[in-house]
Amino acid sequence: MVDGRGVPLSLVVSGANAHDSTLLGRALDARVVAAPKGVEQNVCLDAGFVGKEEEVTTRGCIPHIRPRGEEALEMVRNPDFKARRWVVECFHSWLNRYRKLIPRYEKTDLSHGGLLKLACAMVTLNKVIVIYG
């Protein structure tokens, strides 16, 4: 889970055969940065999370679930519309820069999770440097 600028907020490690929607609750619970008091947290999700709105709202967030292609149509209709989900794809590409992570050679989830957390910390540091100079 990342914020609007691509800074990681939570990380959940699972097998490749687990669907993302089954990990939604764990990802929301694992957030390391909470929203400021009085500010509603918005969560943008893709079509794979249809039916998970209640799980998001029970954790105090507002779900925004768009079917595939609807975001692109909205960009054509409204030139001021800003896409949101591409930030997650950029974050994945930043993680892929750390060649130790792909392919996975670590035997335990603990060691692989530690390397992922280190990579997330490096991405966060780079984003802070870019944003704040």
Identify what each model region corresponds to.
Residues 24, 46, 118:
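Residue-level signal for inorganic ion chemistry
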Residues 112-133:
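C-terminal domain-tail junction helix/linker
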Residues 37-108:
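Helix-centered, glycine/charged polyanion-binding patches within enzymatic domains
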Residues 12-35:
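Active-site beta-loop-alpha junctions of metal-dependent nucleic acid enzymes
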Residues 29, 93, 116-120:
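Generic alpha-helical structural context detector
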Residues 3:
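Short, acidic, Ser/Thr-enriched surface-loop or helix-capping motifs
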